Amino acid sequence: MLGVQKKRSTRKTAARKTVVRKPAAKKTAAKKAPVRKVAAKKTVARKTVAKKTVAARKPVAKKATAKKAPVRKAVAKKTVARKTVAKKTVAARKPVAKKATAKKAPVRKVAAKKTVARKTVAKKTVAARKPVAKKATAKKAPVRKAVAKKTVAKRVASTKKSSVAVKAGVCMKKHKHTAACGRVAASGVKVCASAAKRKMNPNRSRTAHSWRQQLMKLVAR
């Protein structure tokens, strides 16, 4: 417990009756202006207090106490007699005589080379081949048989076909006929020599130039 505890009241708070205080009606009293009385100033005569002359204090004469110088006692130094230690004379080491060991040169054993006796293989003397005598076969000259030429009677194209071709305006060749075919047929030639043969040839290789020319012709039409 720190400090003194405050004593608590023994009265019970429940026993107290709660008194409802009514606010008292304030009386509106007319305030009087306070009249200040001017107090008459009394002239108090000041008495001059006589100053007491305090006797000057005499300085207390200090006693000159002679300071004694501290006397230092000289401590007598003990002279310790040092014993001279006799130095042990170490016997000088004699250098150990090195035994001159003769170094043996490592003897290399030369391996005895075995002389392998090479057997000389007897070369077989191959019998020289005798050139086989070619048989002189008599070449028979090829006998050409004279083929009897058949006298083929040339068929003269009938004038009927040519007249039909002329009327149709085409030649006698089986191909894509052009305007040139009619001119050829009119002249009496049966086979046309126009460019239609080259155009219809399956082995013909087309080039960019030929394609361009063909397109130009188609556009012109």
Curated annotation (Swiss-Prot):
One of its GO terms (molecular function) is structural constituent of chromatin. InterPro entries: HC2 (IPR009970). Residues 1-50, 59-70 have a biased composition (Basic residues). Residues 1-70 are annotated as: Disordered. The keyword Nuclease does not apply. Coiled coil: none annotated. Keywords: DNA-binding, Repeat. One of its GO terms (biological process) is chromosome condensation. It comes from the Bacteria. It holds the Pfam family HC2. Belongs to the histone H1/H5 family. HCT subfamily. Might have a role in establishing the nucleoid structure of elementary bodies. This is Histone H1-like protein HC2. It comes from Chlamydia trachomatis serovar L2 (strain ATCC VR-902B / DSM 19102 / 434/Bu).
